[in-house]
A protein has these predicted regions:
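Compact beta-sheet-dominated domain cores in extracellular/mature segments
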Residues: 25-199
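Flanking scaffold residues of small Cys/His-coordinated metal-binding clusters
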Residues: 11-14
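Bacterial signal peptide processing site
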Residues: 20-23
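Bacterial N-terminal signal peptides that target proteins for export
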Residues: 1-9
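C-terminal motif of bacterial Sec signal peptides marking the signal peptidase cleavage site
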Residues: 16-18
Length: 199
C-alpha cells in the first residue's frame, strides 16, 4: 500500500511540475490575432414560379464598403443613364447585385444586409420580412421584421411598411426612390414588409 501511495505522489508531483509551470512568454513582436467582424448578406430571389430562394453569405465590413463604393461609382459614372442591364452585372464576392434593394440592420449602411429584387416582368412585389431569417441569437432565430435601420435602394422604387395580416398602416411607412440612400430609418422598429414596384 505504501508503495502505490509513493508512486501516486511521484506521478502527481511530476504532472504538477510538467503541466503546471508558468506559461511560456509570447515574443513582444508577435502580432495579436484580430478577427474581422463578419456580417451576413442575405440574397432573396423570386423564382418564375413565385417561390422564393434565399442565399446567405458572410462578408467583412471592408467588403461591404467595397460593394457600396462600387455601386456609388457606377451610379456617378452613368448619371441619369442608369439601366437595370447596366447594374445586373455588378457583383462583388457573389454579393448583392447593384440593381437590388439593400437593407441593413444598423444605421449608415452597416451590419447584416438583406438584398431583394423584383422579377423583371412583375409590376410590383411584396415580401413579409418576418419570413426571412436575419441571424441566430441563442436560442432563437431572429427575422428581418422590424429590424431595418438603413437602406440603399436599387433600380426600383418602393417602400417599407407596417402591415398586419389584413392591412398596412397609412401612417407608418418609409418610401424610397430608385437609388436612394437612407442612413437612418425613423420607423425601423415597426416596418415588417418590403414593397418594390415598376414606375
Amino acid at each position: 500500500m505504501k508503495r502505490s501511495s509513493t508512486w501516486m505522489m511521484v506521478s502527481a508531483l511530476t504532472l504538477v511540475m510538467g503541466c503546471g509551470g508558468a506559461p511560456e512568454d509570447v515574443p513582444p513582436d508577435a502580432p495579436e490575432a484580430q478577427e474581422d467582424v463578419l456580417f451576413s448578406q442575405t440574397i432573396l430571389r423570386e423564382r418564375p414560379d413565385g417561390t422564393m430562394s434565399q442565399e446567405t453569405t458572410f462578408i467583412t465590413r471592408e467588403e461591404q464598403l467595397a460593394q457600396i463604393e462600387a455601386r456609388d461609382a457606377l451610379v456617378r459614372s452613368l448619371g441619369a443613364r442608369v439601366t437595370q442591364q447596366d447594374l445586373d452585372d455588378l457583383l462583388i464576392d457573389s454579393g448583392c447585385a447593384g440593381s437590388s434593394l439593400w437593407l441593413f440592420d444598423q444605421t449608415s449602411r452597416t451590419g447584416n444586409q438583406l438584398c431583394l429584387y423584383k422579377q423583371a416582368g412583375a409590376d410590383a412585389a411584396w415580401l413579409n420580412l418576418g419570413t426571412v431569417i436575419r441571424k441566430f441569437t441563442n436560442p432563437y432565430f431572429v427575422t428581418w421584421a422590424n429590424a431595418v435601420r438603413s437602406l440603399y435602394s436599387g433600380v426600383h422604387p418602393g417602400a417599407l411598411q407596417s402591415c398586419t395580416a389584413t392591412s398596412c398602416s397609412t401612417l407608418i411607412y418609409q418610401s424610397f426612390n430608385a437609388y436612394q440612400l437612407l442612413n437612418t430609418i425613423s420607423y425601423g422598429t415597426q416596418l415588417n414588409w418590403a414593397y418594390l414596384y415598376t414606375p
